[in-house]
Amino acid sequence: GIHGSPTAVMAFEGATGWLVGPENRGMASMFTMMNNARLAVGAQGVGLAEAAWQHAMHYAMDRKQGRTPRGPGAIIDHADVRRMLAEARAEIFAARAITLACGLAINLSHATNAPHWEARAALLTPIAKAHATDIGCEVTSLGVQVHGGMGFVEETGAAQFYRDVRITPIYEGTNGIQAMDLVGRKLSDGGESAFRLLQEIEDHAEHAHTTLPTLTGDVWEAAETLRETTEWMLAAEATDRAAGAVPYLRAFARVLGGHYHLRAAMADPSGPRARLARVFVDRILPEHETLCLRARA
């Protein structure tokens, strides 16, 4: 269970209930209250993923087992362990970047009162909460996998990260609710805020093409596929949108992850950021296509 939480059963009996906001608008009012909490839970997912990754990395560098093509050595020299650690690192970077972009949009909306930033913050909030916590669960699970059987030995601490993070896709609105919020309330502007963000992604990919031609094409094409899926969502019946909401949110997060990795790579085209971006674009970003197909199914 979750420790240190004030969650409890409360019996109000004959207490008077007061409406929150106008009649039939209570949910919208509640989401206004929850926005900061949703972003904070996303940050919790990122933090636990980072802690689990560092824990797994140290173990992989220390644990000697088996033989690699280079002879006996630590398990970090095994190809699949290296793959898990590299993909987890790329996932954490993307989830952190989405969370930071959401926080920046919230700050700018407060500082400027500009409708553009208010819309951007609203669009990114459900994505940041849902995706960062999903990635938290996936990366902490990978951390256990890197440890092998030792991951189930309590003293290693690997499983604790997973137990701690598993609540995050549930509270402050389940991730399914976040996805419903995205395809419902956040696309209710006719997709204007989503299309504006996708245009920024495509424009940046075109700008970066001369410097990083092997990365930019994939990012641009992913944004275009998501644009087409967004158009489908806007034209679909409400039940069809709801059925495709979860894969749509994840596809959106994949495209955003590719965009932020590309921006980081542009700041260091021959350094580690560019190599990490290559991992994401080659191994993780392609998921967006299947996710978009599932969203439209």
Where do the language-model regions lie?
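Internal glycine-rich alpha/beta core junctions
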Residues: G1-T225
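C-terminal amphipathic alpha-helical interaction region
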Residues: D189, E200-A297
